[in-house]
C-alpha cells in the first residue's frame, strides 16, 4: 500500500493538454480513523498530511531537464476530543457517600442518589474545561461533593445549575491513566403527578473546553438522567418507577 492517488490523461481528460496559464483541479476524499491512535502519554497533536506532485514531459527549450515538476503540501490539524460520562447510583458506598431513602422511589419521600461525572481528554491539551448540568424539578443539592482534583462542583440554588470548573487538562488524561471524576449527592422527592412514572433527576450534562492545538472550542455531552436510567446494577428495572 503506497497511500498514493494518481490522475493522468487516461482518467482525467483535461490533463491531456494544458494551455499556458490554464488551471484546473481534481478532488478526492478519504476516511479517517474513528479513534485516536493513542498508546502512550506523548501521543497527541495529530495531523493529516497530503503531498501533491504534478509533472509533464513538456520542458521549456531553455531548461536541461527530463520533465517539469510542481509540488505542494497540505497539513491539517486534527481536533481533539473531550468527553463526559454522567452516572447515577443509589448504592454507592465505594464513593464514601451514603445514600438513603426508599427504593423504589416513593411520592413525597426523599431518596438520595450520587451523581458521578467522569471526564476524559484525548489527543490535545485543553484549557478552560467546564462541566455543567441542571437539577430537575423536585431534586435538591445536599452539599456532599468530592473530586479527584482540587476543583469540585458547585451549585447555584437560584438557577439549579451544577458547575465543575476543571480548567486545564493535558492530552490523553483518562485514556492512558485515570480519568477526572467528580461526585455529588442529590435528594429527589417525587410529586404526586409522578406516580407510576420515572422521575427526571439531572438534565443533559455538557462539557466544554478550548483546544490549544487547533485554537477552537470543543464540546461534548451525555444524556439526561432519570430514575429509569440510573447506572446502579443493584436497582432492578421494577424498582425505578415512582410508587404512591
Question: Where are the predicted features?
Answer:
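Extracellular/luminal low-complexity Ser/Thr/Pro-rich, glycosylation-prone repeat/linker regions
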Residues: 38-100, 140-151, 195, 199-244
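Short beta-strand elements of extracellular/lumenal beta-sandwich folds
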Residues: 96-133
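Intrinsic-disorder/low-complexity, polar/charged segments enriched in Ser/Thr/Lys/Arg/Asp/Glu/Gln
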Residues: 23-27, 71-73, 110-114, 128-130, ...
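Gram-negative and organellar
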Residues: 21, 110-113, 137-140, 217-218
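Low-complexity, intrinsically disordered segments enriched in Ser/Thr together with acidic residues
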Residues: 8-46, 51-60, 116-120, 165-214
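A surface/secretory-pathway sequence property marking extracellular, secreted
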Residues: 1-17, 86-93, 128-172, 223, ...
